[in-house]
Amino acid sequence: MGKKKNNSSNAAHVLESSVAPILELNFTDPLFTTAAHPTKPLLISGFATGHLYCNSYNGEKLEELEQVNREKAIERQQKAYEAGTITHVNKSVSQLKSKWWTTFNDIKDVPSKGEELVNVQTNWKTKRHKGSCRHAIFDPRTDCLGDYLYTCGTDNIIKKAATETGKVVGKVDVVADYSSAKDKLTKLCHSTTHPFLLSGTEDGHVLVYDSSNLGGTNKIKFKVELAHDDSINHILSMPAVSPYHYLTLGSTTLSHIDIRKGIITQSDDQEDELLAMSYTTDELSENKNDTVLVSHGEGIITIWKNSKNKLADQLTRIKVNKTASIDAIVPTMNNDDENGMASSVWCGDSEGLLHRVNYKRGRVVETRLHSVARGKSDAVDEVGVLDIDYDYRLISAGMDSLKIWSNRYSDDQEEEEEEEEEEEEEEDSVSGTDSGSDEESFSDISSVDFDSENNDDGEELLDKEQWEDVEDEDIPVGTDGSTRNEENKDNTKSEYILPFKRKRRDFSEVITKPKKKLIDINKLTKPSKKEDDGDDNNKSLQEQEKAEEVPQFKKQKVKEKKVTAKQLRNMQKHEHGIRKFEGL
């Protein structure tokens, strides 16, 4: 009996994008890390063997070659379809039998620099570490952007090398700075303004070195002990706050640290492993570090906001793939909002899928397949690393392969996204229901209490349906906590209720106007004898038949109560209520 496909793989094929890679590199040795140069078409690859490769590529030529080969392949399929040899024209990238983009079966097969004029070449390669190469990053400082490369390995050495030649210009052995001799390095992070090189360890410590003087007399500058109870999974700088402030992920918590003073705040236990994090493209372009998106081991993305609760807990969550872990996340770095790129992040999961998540809409809007299992023996290449190259192309990598994806969307893809947005807007306008009300939806809101003074800081992160999710529709509440009813002259302010504290609206409130004509049940009941006599005298047989054919809804008449003598006397004497002053 064959293995049944799960819902996530089926959904991935439905949402699969028509965008294809322009370059694919396969490896015989496990790939542990990769980094893209911020301003040049350079790619660094670090392997479990300790080797380091630097490859350059011509992105424009690869784009043109991929487009030409795609058109030829579709044309061949079209002719075969017209001839009746195939049942349909396949445009799915994951189901192709032959690839139309540039592919190398092994990175060792890439020609070296100067051998021949090709679109991909190896600039240099070296045995950088005795153990595995765990992480590699480029220097992010503006005065030397991408000029230097930093790597760390299981040999407990951090090395600094020139990007152009690969020659080591500085290194430091960190064993003496460990609290335990069995500790190992995991992640690196460099300040965008200062020569601060941070390294995370398996025991949860953060070591800070002077990158301009690696191996000098003053080795370690700062040390933050036990930032987490377990291994450091990610380090993120906060240049908009301070060059000394950073965010770290480890085990099930997120920490805000000052490398001089230690932990500033640490989040609540999320009861799920936090694997990676990134800022939003919007805030990066505006030089802000307030909103953070964190990927989880249970297949979700959570949204955090420093201005709301000092990163004590998540604000909302977005379901991505409940059968896989989200191991990598990166912003699109593209401010072009025509395709929703400015409000999206890329995620890679353990099933080899790539998801573009629009965090403002709270859903996955595009899926690409980095790896597809073919046959029983073929395993899925889990996406462990994501990056963006100098021309905003997505780079996805697992242990077995690396792909650089095209940044050009086809007309069909853009039309499909526009149709989806229009359908969503129509559904919202008709139903008005909350998109997160489904039992399977993960876009619910945390029940953390926040001050109403900060409620304006994160409104853009929540779906517009959630902001409309107000239980009392007759008296809308403004963001300042006061009612918007002009007739209400009471100056007292009603208590402001945040969207994530409100109860979900009852479904009966969604129904506005019935599509079918309502039938008055009183018309269908048997009338009394007196009413029969009156109806026979006043209505003709033709009018009765017409009334039976098209029953009309009428408002029931309320029987007026007669005023008693005592009530009349009290009204005349003004003993109850407010007196009316005549002549004023």
Swiss-Prot record:
GO biological process: positive regulation of transcription by RNA polymerase I; ribosomal large subunit biogenesis; rRNA processing
Principal location listed in the UniProt entry: nucleus
Compositionally biased residues, Acidic residues: 412-429, 450-460
Similarity-based family: Belongs to the WD repeat WDR55 family.
Region ranges (Disordered): 409-497, 516-563
Highest taxon of the lineage: Eukaryota
Organism (species): Lodderomyces elongisporus (strain ATCC 11503 / CBS 2605 / JCM 1781 / NBRC 1676 / NRRL YB-4239) (Yeast)
The name this protein goes by in its record: WD repeat-containing protein JIP5
CC annotations in GO: nucleolus
